[in-house]
Amino acid sequence: MSQLVYFSSSSENTQRFIERLGLPAVRIPLNERERIQVDEPYILIVPSYGGGGTAGAVPRQVIRFLNDEHNRALLRGVIASGNRNFGEAYGRAGDVIAQKCGVPWLYRFELMGTQSDIENVRKGVTEFWQRQPQNA
């Protein structure tokens, strides 16, 4: 199975979701000066920012990570977290990334997710990678 890459703000909601998920994952650093580069296909798990608008929905650190052409080329799907209080903008970062990068938006969950979200993502990620061609 390929990996998960995620970003978590200082609230650590996404970090807690990843820990409960129990799958291999690499964190995009909170410090914008630190960089990572991935070397295998991955699914991105990202929180949504901005209080409901498109502008600012994707964290700057994630934009910087995806601006690296090598990292962007290995992206295979996106999972977004958000806050249902933002209505239609709930999980907006997933919409933005999926559309701009041409990858499927696989799932969204609220804040740090429920046990049902954990089970759905674990199962969905496994099934997603099983459907992918070997050299994808």
Curated annotation (Swiss-Prot):
GO process terms (BP): protein modification process
Coiled coil ranges: none
Pfam families in the cross-refs: Flavodoxin_NdrI
InterPro entries in the cross-refs: Flavoprotein-like_sf, RNR_Ib_NrdI_bac, RNR_NrdI
Gene3D superfamilies linked: 3.40.50.360
Domain of life: Bacteria
Gene Ontology molecular functions: FMN binding
Function of the molecule: Probably involved in ribonucleotide reductase function.
Matches recorded under NCBIfam families: nrdI (TIGR00333)
Protein family: Belongs to the NrdI family.
Protein known as: Protein NrdI
Species, as recorded: Escherichia coli O139:H28 (strain E24377A / ETEC)
